[in-house]
């Protein structure tokens, strides 16, 4: 080798330096992209802990944590880049104290809970993720499992009356007639009996004044005495004795939340029904009403396909 030939730095010496720099760059990039996701609610229950841990497992690149509502400052004192997830009505009441604050996802809030607090308005930087199954989906479920029915009975009270317009709009393209009856006093059975006499099936609303543990027995016995099925209002009611309902479980909500958190907060919807869902049916009730067995998975797939079709 010539004495004046330049010496080359051995590759073996340069490689560790290159890998070190690349690793530091990767860590810096990941740290810059990590989001601060704050879940809050009035109580730190085992269910809340399980949900938080499941979201942490889905988003290991982010800082996902739960903080009890009582430990937080007012919303306008939180960092603006925090992504806030509210888990219950008390946390929504806290968020509504201030107009300013971080972008907020209100998880699993019912239409009634929102209407009582907001009316028809949706404040800026709030995204309301409805816990109710959309009425259009529930009516499609009726068409799938009870294709012969035409008159759909709906009980309502002063709290849920505002939902009737949406139900009627959803029923019209399906050729279904909505027959409604006001039921302000659940101890008076006459409105229920009157409605059952004028309808082919009963569609339950997510209205706890009408559908609750105290009214469930009367609702179900009265309906089935007239050979009328009850659809909805929830999976819990199906377990109690209604025929069927669409619903979204924790896995569905985790997937929905995960998808939203991947998006810029400016693109979050103002309101959103759960796009992922399942169907639950009560086969014993189906048999007692002389209804063909319901394949819940197949019906859910058919409903989802219909919603995604242009």
Where are these regions (language model features)?
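Polar low-complexity intrinsically disordered regions enriched in Ser/Thr and small residues
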Residues: 7, 15-16, 50
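Intrinsically disordered/low-complexity terminal segments and short unstructured peptides
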Residues: 8, 27-28, 39, 103
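Bacterial N-terminal signal peptides
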Residues: 16-28
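Bacterial Sec-dependent signal peptides at the C-terminal "C-region" and cleavage site
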Residues: 28-34
């Amino acid at each position: 080798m010539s004495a004046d030939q330049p010496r080359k730095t051995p590759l073996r010496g340069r490689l560790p330096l290159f890998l070190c720099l690349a690793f530091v760059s990767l860590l810096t990039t990941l740290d810059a992209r990590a989001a601060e996701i704050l879940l809050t609610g009035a109580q730190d229950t085992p269910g809340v802990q399980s949900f938080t841990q499941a979201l942490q497992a889905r988003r290991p690149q982010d800082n996902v944590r739960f903080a009890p509502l009582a430990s937080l400052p007012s919303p306008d004192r939180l960092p603006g880049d925090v992504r806030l997830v509210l888990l219950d009505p008390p946390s929504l009441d806290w968020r509504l104290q201030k107009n300013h604050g971080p972008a907020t996802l209100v998880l699993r809030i019912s239409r009634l809970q929102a209407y009582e607090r907001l009316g028809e308005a949706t404040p800026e930087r709030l995204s309301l993720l409805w816990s109710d199954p959309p009425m259009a989906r529930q009516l499609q479920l009726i068409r799938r499992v009870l294709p012969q029915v035409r008159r759909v009975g709906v009980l309502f009270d002063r709290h849920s009356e505002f939902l009737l317009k949406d139900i009627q709009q959803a029923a019209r393209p399906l050729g279904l007639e909505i027959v409604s009856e006001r039921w302000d006093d659940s101890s008076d059975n006459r409105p229920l009996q009157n409605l059952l006499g004028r309808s082919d099936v009963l569609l339950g609303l997510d209205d706890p004044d009408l559908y609750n543990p105290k009214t469930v027995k009367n609702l179900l016995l009265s309906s089935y005495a007239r050979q009328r099925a009850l659809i909805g209002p929830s999976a819990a009611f199906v377990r109690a004795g209604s025929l069927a309902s669409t619903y979204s479980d924790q896995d569905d909500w985790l997937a929905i939340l995960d998808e939203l958190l991947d998006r810029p907060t400016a693109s979050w919807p103002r309101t959103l029904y759960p796009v992922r869902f399942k169907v639950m049916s009560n086969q014993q009730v189906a048999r007692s009403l002389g209804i063909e067995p319901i394949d819940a998975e197949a019906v859910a797939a058919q409903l989802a396909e219909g919603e995604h079709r242009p």
